[in-house]
Amino acid sequence: MTKSYMPLFRSPRQFKKIYFILIPLILAVIILHVFFDGFNKISEYSPTFISNRILNHQDQQQKSEKSSDVISSYFPSLAIYPKNFDNRVEFVNEPKNSKWIQYFGDSKTVLSNYITNQTYTNHSIGLYSSSTVRPPASSCKDILYERSFEITKYRTLHDDLYKLATTLLYQLENDPAFQDLSPFFNDRLPHIIMRGELHKHIYKFAGTSVWLEQHGVHLMLSRVIYSQQGKKNDPQLSLLYAQVYDENWNELNDIELIVPVINPNGERVYDSVKYPQFLAIPFYHNSEYIKSRWYGPEDTRLILTKNKFGDDEPVIIFNSYHRQIKDMSTEDDNNVHTKFEFYRSMFVGWLFQYQLGKLNTDGIQDSKFNNVTFNKVKELRIEGKERTSIEKNWTPFIDPDERNQISYYGNHNLGDNYVYIVYQWNHLKILKCELDNFIDSSHSTCTMFFKDVETTQEVGPVRGGTELWPIKIDNNNNNNNLNEDDLSTKQEPQQQRQLWIGFLRAHVKDCGCGGSMYRPNFLILEKLNSKFKLTYLSGSINFNVSVYGWANYDVVCAGHEANALIPNGISMFDQDDDYLTLSMSVADQDNTLVHIHGVKKLIYSLDHDWNGILKENKQIECVVNNANDFCKAYADEHYKLGDSEAAIKEVKQKAKEEAEKAKAEKEKAEKEKAEKEKAEKEKEEKEKEEKEEKEKAEKEKEEKEKAEKELAEKELAEQKDEDAKDEDKNEDEDDKEKNDESGLTEKSEVEENGENTNEGGEDDGDGDGEEEKEDDDDIEV
């Protein structure tokens, strides 16, 4: 059964009304697209790219419900061609995404309305000068300049750990450069993903980025560490994760950049590179030995250079654990025995240049990597110096005065041939390292280009930090401040002074907050002829960023942990409008951005009158003192807020003491109650016993009295009986005596009257017998 047809417009009038709305809307979108959108379809750039695929895409766009929303239609799957795309260059891997566009925006695109329209607040900093023109400073206050710039509220970039983990899992299974890393994960990664425990094993931080002007995007590299045991301070593997962001710092997922790369043969070709992805940085590793070994690139700094073809070349400076051959010997069994030494050394790497194998990191070439493509890296070796066990915290920068104009088709090698590196900030030491035309192809040779004074002092607490960004200012040094002793070093006036700005990190230990503290320090480095000077260095800056605990998010200044806010890179610096974006990390666990307005204004507000003379100064000492004071103040503040370990311990101790006190009081009360109850019970029992005893005694008394009474009565009765008996006896005796007396009388009478008695014997005898019988009866009774 078919449905009846229902027309879209029921009348021509409705059709016209719709057109009156649609036509202006479409025209407005086209105008906005042309004037404000830096992206255009690649088919509009070159007719050679008009293909069935592009036409199909355009056909689909015409049918799409979002055909008027041109910008959003580019995403999520997209391939971006550079605005200087050269179709004469060979293409090795064409993009897999169905949507192709080319970027035509200008260099100002990096400063978007998103950045300029944010709310900025004043932020004060103190800078310590190393000026030798001013009178010798007796205290830190004498060289302190109070200045300020404006900052936005910090923004923490979202970490999609699921996307990161699935990308890693795909590369472990499919990318030859990563397959050998699989044993580190022991097939646990899928289970970790399923259980939702990625945050326990994977940490992403130390993000640093560059703006790719030819593509109109930020390319950010972050360090990703993996811990088998789920402990952030005990990782086994460190990798580099590359992501692409637009000018508003929105991540562009599953995007391809068409970039000019230099293949292992040294040829310039176009390649399609998909992001996000983990970079195939070669490094030595052994999954069977993981104790006290952290494999992979660390402390990566990203800097944009120009290669010999004139292309923007993202270059990384990092340190990595590697091995090198120390000794090789042949034993009696004719087997070659190799002894290795292990180092943590500095390397330079190229994001768009490649190599086969990893001989330069493993010490020997393993045949299984012979045909595996890695990013090109070279160890940075200081000329005339043996390798040390650990090298780290180098600060890179490019000198634009040495950057020549590029002429690729003229076959000129005129790119950035060198990168400068600040090797040490206290007693300044600067290296100059090769980026091309290597003296020794196995490494990049670094020469000690400048050193303040000869010293064996180790790297101090001020170190590392971001890459340095060049800036030129008008010269205000007229040499009027030179004294007679300095005439021999008098310099000719320059039209402009070459400066570099950046952010170091002061690392102070045992300062009152946990084990140590890291905070950014703004710096200004100056070059005069071939001499360098750290002219200004600020005290610790917090940028109003909340620094949470290293292990426990809610507890700061804990144990031996670091309280860390570390500057990673300058993402952009628009000098015309004076905006700068700084990337930082908190507690080695995230990437945070702060936009700054007024850095250039701050620089121009300072004196720049260095005449090339180098003298001792208190600058570094003052900065370190400031860092220690900052640390103590921070610890005191968070002690008052109650989220420091000391405050929490005190609260817990007080709570424990109060609990113990309450327990003791409770026990005391219970004891007193028990004792009272016991006493009352004992009293009751005693009273009861006394009562019972009393009653018993009374009863016994009564019974005794009764018995005594009865006994007395009995005795009385008996006495009475006895008395009666005695009385009777006495009476009987009296009677007897009487009788005896009567008898004697009678006898005498008889004797006297013997004859009378004998004559009347029967009658008298009978009578006398009856009287005796009666007497006997009376006695018996």
From Swiss-Prot:
It comes from Candida albicans (strain SC5314 / ATCC MYA-2876) (Yeast). It is found in: Membrane. GO terms for molecular function: mannosyltransferase activity. Residues 751-781 have a biased composition (Acidic residues). Keywords: Cell wall biogenesis/degradation, Coiled coil, Glycosyltransferase, Membrane, Signal-anchor, Transferase, Transmembrane, Transmembrane helix. Belongs to the BMT family. Beta-mannosyltransferase involved in cell wall biosynthesis. Required for the elongation of beta-mannose chains on the acid-labile fraction of cell wall phosphopeptidomannan. Residues 663-728, 736-750 have a biased composition (Basic and acidic residues). The keyword Phosphoprotein does not apply. Induction: Expression in regulated by TSA1 and repressed in rat catheter biofilm. Residues 663-781 are annotated as: Disordered. The keyword Chloroplast does not apply. It is an enzyme of class 2 (transferase). Its EC number is 2.4.1.-. Pfam families: BMT. It is a single-pass type II membrane protein. Residues 39-781 are extracellular. Residues 640-733 form a coiled coil. This is Beta-mannosyltransferase 4. Disruption phenotype: Impairs the elongation of beta-mannose chains on the acid-labile fraction of cell wall phosphopeptidomannan. Its main location: membrane. GO terms for cellular component: membrane. The chain crosses the membrane at residues 18-38. It comes from the Eukaryota.
